[in-house]
Amino acid sequence: MTGRQQWCDGVLAGPGGAMTDEVGVITGPLTVRTTAVPGGRVRIEIQYEDAEEWYTLTGSPVPDRGDPAAVHAAALAAVRTGHEAGAPGGAAPA
């Protein structure tokens, strides 16, 4: 892999928050981290702002479709929208 491999930005979760595999829905000020991984996929993780523990955004990892930065932007948009947001292009929450 070449170029940038990780993106990390703060976001305020919309109503209904974001769905994680480990703890369910989280809300409020969050940080989203997207990391390119081998095989043309990206892993999307989320944490409470300034926390230490990261959680997997439900549906992650997802295909990067050749533009992992766009997947990161889509993940931020999904979390801003809320409604138990999961990874863009990933599995829907149960």
Predicted regions, residues:
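Mixed-charge, Lys/Arg-enriched low-complexity segments
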Residues: E53, P61-A94
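A ubiquitous, low-specificity "background" feature that marks scattered single residues
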Residues: T27, I46, A70-A73
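Generic, ordered loop/turn and secondary-structure boundary motif
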Residues: T27, Y55-T58
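A short, structured beta-strand/loop element
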Residues: P38-Y55
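Negatively charged, low-complexity tracts enriched in Asp/Glu with abundant Ser/Thr
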Residues: M1-R33
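Amphipathic alpha-helical interface segments used for dimerization/assembly
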Residues: T34, V42, I46, A75-V79, ...
